[in-house]
Amino acid sequence: MDLTSKVNRLLAEFAGRIGLPSLSLDEEGMASLLFDEQVGVTLLLLAERERLLLEADVAGIDVLGEGIFRQLASFNRHWHRFDLHFGFDELTGKVQLYAQILAAQLTLECFEATLANLLDHAEFWQRLLPCDSDREAVAAVGMRV
C-alpha cells in the first residue's frame, strides 16, 4: 500500500472515531481541521520524505512583540522534549507549531497522541500570546472538530 493510501485509511478511521463524516488528503496531500473554533491544524503528507507533518496555527506574526521570539527560540532549542517546534508561515502571517510522524511509526494511536500533544501546546501558547483578531480566516478552512 502506498503512503497516501495508508494516511487516508488512518484519517478515515480517525474521522469515524471522533464523529466526522469523512477525512482524507486532497490531491496536494493536505487536510485541515479546526478544533474548538480556536486551533487550525493542517496535515501535510511529505511522501518523498516519508512523513506526515502537522501544523497548528498559534497566532498572527503581526500581533507578537519582539520579546516573544526569544521565548519561541528557547522552546525550539528544547524541541526534543516535546517533539514539537515553532516556525513562521510568511504566506499566512502565522506563527505555527509543528510536529511530524515518520511513515514507519504512523499508526492511529501515534497520530492521536501526536495530535493531542500538538493541540495541548498550541492552546497553551495561544493563552500566552496576544489574541489573534483573524480567527475567521481559520474558521473558514477545513473540517470542524
Curated annotation (Swiss-Prot):
Gene3D superfamilies tied to this protein: 3.30.1460.10
What's a BP term from Gene Ontology annotated to this protein? protein secretion by the type III secretion system
Effect of deleting the gene: Deletion mutant results in a two to three-fold reduction in extracellular exoenzyme S activity representing the efficiency of type III secretion system (T3SS). Mutant also demonstrates a lag in the induction of cytotoxicity towards Chinese hamster ovary cells and is attenuated for virulence in a mouse pneumonia model.
Per UniProt, activity regulation is:
In the absence of inducing signals, ExsE interacts with and inhibits ExsC activity.
Primary location class = cytoplasm
Q: Where in the cell is it found?
A: Cytoplasm
Which keywords has UniProt assigned to this entry? Cytoplasm
GO cellular component terms listed in the entry, alphabetical order: cytoplasm
- Alphabetical list of Pfam families matching this protein: CesT
Question: How does the annotation summarize its subunit structure?
Answer: Homodimer. Interacts with ExsE. Interacts directly with ExsD to form a heterotetrameric complex.
The UniProt function text for this chain reads: Part of the regulatory cascade that plays a role in the transcriptional regulation of the type III secretion system (T3SS). Interacts with antiactivator ExsD to inhibit its activity leading to ExsA-mediated transcription.
The name on file for this protein is Transcriptional anti-antiactivator ExsC
Q: Which gene is this protein's source? A: exsC
